[in-house]
Structure formats: structure tokens, C-alpha cells
């Protein structure tokens, strides 16, 4: 999908990859970019529409869906990542509330609009969905769950004309990764690669050098083949 003249919603748009995605969408000619944040965002470009949106707040989600109406692309970027060792169930619940249920709730709320526009859902995930990083265990669990959710949505929505993309990021220079002393890709380059993958209709997008090193083996691997095979059960059930 090309972004020119499209209406887009980016959650978690105040900083990091989310803010970079807003800027890149504008560069690529988006008609309107709704910037979903818990605290309203100010922006110099009139195409940016600030939107108060906490992805764990059902009332705000419903209000956003009503206010926006027609939508071409939903980018589920809002997330939380904290260090933990799975000893505190409240910590796991917090990560799941934002990183998993946030994606689920936003996607369900905007599905009618996306189906009508034959649009796209872009879920910003992480390579820890494939192999957990134990120092951020709850984050890893939530992203693995969100990846499975993404694959399941993909199977059900392909026949309705909605593309569902998983963005499996490696280390990117954001506040979430500030404490990690490792090489990081820039937010701007990640945003460019994400939209490049969307425009090229890549199901799974690997937007930085670390994640890109896994792309070929993942796309041609047995697990990806099984995903496609399992998706056929949906098509068979509807036949």
C-alpha cells in the first residue's frame, strides 16, 4: 500500500518509532495522520491530527473510532517495556494490557473502517517475539502473544482485503532501549524501512540491521511455511 493520500492512525506517536512514523508518513504524502498519544501532541503540519488515546482505555478507543471514521492504515505502535523476571504478576498484566490487548482492542474497533477501505494493520513488534530476552521477560511474553495475534488476524482478514503486517524490530535508538549498550538503528531509518515493507506488501518486516539478518531464514523457514499452511484452515472453513 502506498501512503499517498491515505488516512493513517499511529498509536504511541509522541516519541521513538511512533514519532518517526508520523514524520515519514507526512514525507510520503499521507492525507491525514492521526497521532494517538495519552497526552495530546502538538505538530506544525496541519495534516497531523492530535488524538488523546490510551490503548488500555475502552472509552477512548471507541471515541477515536467514531471521530476518525474512514481509515486506511492502523499502526499499533504504543508499547511498554520494563525490566523484570516474571516474579510479579502485575508486571506481566501491565505488559499484556498495552502490548497485546491494546493491539487487539484497537484492531477490533477499526476493523469495519479498514475492511471498507481495504486497508492495512501494521503491528510494531520485536524480534523478542521469536526469541525472548529474559531481562525483559514480560515484554518478551507480550510481544510473542502479539505476534501470534498478528498472524491470526492475518489469516482471517486476508479474505476481506485487509493486509496485516508484523514489524519485528531489533535494537532501535528509542527510550525503551536507552539502557542497552549495543549498536542501534536510528528511528528514522526504521520508519523508512517499515513503510518500505508495507509498500512492498511484506507480511513480516525486519526494519534494522540486526533483525534484517534474520529475515531470509525466517521467510524461507519451516515455521513461516506452517503459518501459511495453518491459515488454509480458515479458507477451507469459509469455502
Name what the model sees in each region.
Residues 14-15:
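Conserved glycine-rich cofactor-binding loop
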Residues 96, 107, 142:
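Active-site helix of classical SDR
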Residues 79-94, 135-138:
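Conserved mid-core segment of classical short-chain dehydrogenase/reductases
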Residues 126:
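Residue(s) in the substrate-gating loop at a strand-loop-helix junction
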Residues 166, 174, 178-217:
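C-terminal helical subdomain
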Residues 50, 95-96:
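A hydrophobic alpha-helix adjacent to the NAD(P)-binding/active-site core of NAD(P)-dependent oxidoreductases
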Residues 45-58:
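Rossmann-fold cofactor-recognition segment
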Amino acid at each position: 500500500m502506498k501512503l499517498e493520500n491515505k488516512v493513517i492512525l499511529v498509536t504511541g506517536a509522541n516519541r521513538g518509532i511512533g514519532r518517526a512514523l508520523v514524520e515519514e508518513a507526512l514525507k510520503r504524502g499521507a492525507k491525514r495522520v492521526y497521532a494517538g498519544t495519552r497526552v495530546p501532541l502538538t505538530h506544525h503540519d496541519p495534516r497531523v491530527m492530535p488524538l488523546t488515546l490510551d490503548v488500555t482505555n475502552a472509552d477512548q478507543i471507541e471515541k477515536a473510532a467514531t471521530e476518525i471514521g474512514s481509515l486506511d492504515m492502523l499502526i499499533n505502535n504504543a508499547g511498554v517495556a520494563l525490566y523484570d523476571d516474571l516474579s510479579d504478576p502485575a508486571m506481566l498484566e501491565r505488559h499484556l494490557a498495552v502490548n497485546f490487548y491494546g493491539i487487539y482492542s484497537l484492531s477490533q474497533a477499526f476493523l469495519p473502517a479498514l475492511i471498507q477501505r481495504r486497508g492495512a494493520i501494521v503491528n510494531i513488534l520485536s524480534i523478542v517475539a521469536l526469541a525472548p530476552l529474559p531481562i525483559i521477560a514480560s515484554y518478551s511474553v507480550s510481544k510473542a502473544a502479539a505476534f501470534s495475534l498478528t498472524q491470526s488476524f492475518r489469516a482471517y482478514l486476508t479474505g476481506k482485503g485487509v493486509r496485516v503486517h508484523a514489524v519485528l524490530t531489533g535494537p532501535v535508538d528509542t527510550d525503551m532501549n536507552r539502557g542497552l549498550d549495543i549498536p542501534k538503528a536510528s528511528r528514522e531509518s526504521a520508519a523508512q524501512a517499515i513503510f518500505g515493507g508495507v509498500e512492498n506488501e511484506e507480511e513480516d518486516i525486519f526494519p534494522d540491521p540486526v533483525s534484517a539478518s534474520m529475515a531470509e531464514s525466517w521467510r524461507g523457514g519451516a515455521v513461516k511455511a506452517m503459518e501459511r499452511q495453518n491459515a488454509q484452515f480458515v479458507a477451507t472453513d469459509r469455502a
